[in-house]
């Protein structure tokens, strides 16, 4: 029976970053990463829009994102291509939002600027949608835009590949096509009586039951995203997160292709990652295909449910997203869907950021809430501190964060006031 020092379940971006930082701090640890996929980053990491921003009013969110962006930037600068493009985030806003305290705070906090209605029109965006359509669909006129300049897009497979390359060089073992079905609990000190563990015994996770047999370890870490509930509920542990389906549509037209080179910031001629004012539909430029990836995170109306192989619904696009898009962006009028896919966000509905919890010899990294890529490296550093029992950790770039602030019992995450 092989026994590891640490068994990590989940080879998505959170699991890979956690493994990287734990192994970096503890080079002698014997670590194995399990995943049900045929290789790494095949779950929701692969389906991510993979955009990044440091435009957050919440200091917690800002620390996690800005630290990760700085790390990724340095990795790419040193020669490992992550597909990073600093084409900016463009938040299109009505008059009230543009003049809000949140925007004024951000202009003083992060590298950002305001662009005018005229500049927005030059991008190919209609600032005043048709009045009748606006009345029916609750569309807002655009007064201006907030541009986050230390923001942009990247390629999730390249980021995952960076971590895997480093981990393999450090001797971390990977076991793919290995579905973890159950966490097996046992008494810390066995009496070998039937019915153990009893309520008066200290308990630990002894092993994980998988499709490839049982794996044993001294310590365990779950980075299982929306599947965390399935593993924790049988133990009576609440993950405090829910799965939220997100659909992405790759949309093409001749006019959309022309829009791709219209920029608002950065050295490249590349359209910014853009968020419409209402509904807050995302437009993610894809420089390779010269198409937009279109997505929207629904609130009320989209239930919390989990499908094993989710698909995107083109009727949903036609009846919901397209009707809004053609009013704001005329280039969508003669467009067509070339591809589509769907995934899930692991939503922490308390404050929309990661949750780090420790139960027995089990660490849990959960609730990335759609920000997994942009906060992943910092999340891995917090996970390493949680694993080692440290009270705080110093993130890449020098900022410090308390581990308990991102837990549950002593959670201290300041409210995000830039609501998109």
Regions found by a protein language model. Give the residues of each.
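Beta1/beta-strand and adjacent pyrophosphate-binding region of the FAD-binding site
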Residues: 1-14, 32
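Conserved Rossmann-like nucleotide-cofactor binding loop
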Residues: 14, 39, 227
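Glycine-rich FAD pyrophosphate-binding loop
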Residues: 23-45
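Dinucleotide-binding Rossmann-like beta1-alpha1 core, especially the glycine-rich loop
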Residues: 49-132, 280
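Flavin (FAD/FMN) cofactor-binding and adjacent substrate-gating region
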Residues: 95-203
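Flavin (FAD/FMN) cofactor-binding core of flavoprotein oxidoreductases
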Residues: 118-128, 153, 312-388, 397-414
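Central helical "cap/lid" subdomain
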Residues: 210-266
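Active-site lid/adjacent beta-loop-alpha segment flanking the redox-cofactor pocket in flavoenzymes
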Residues: 257-360
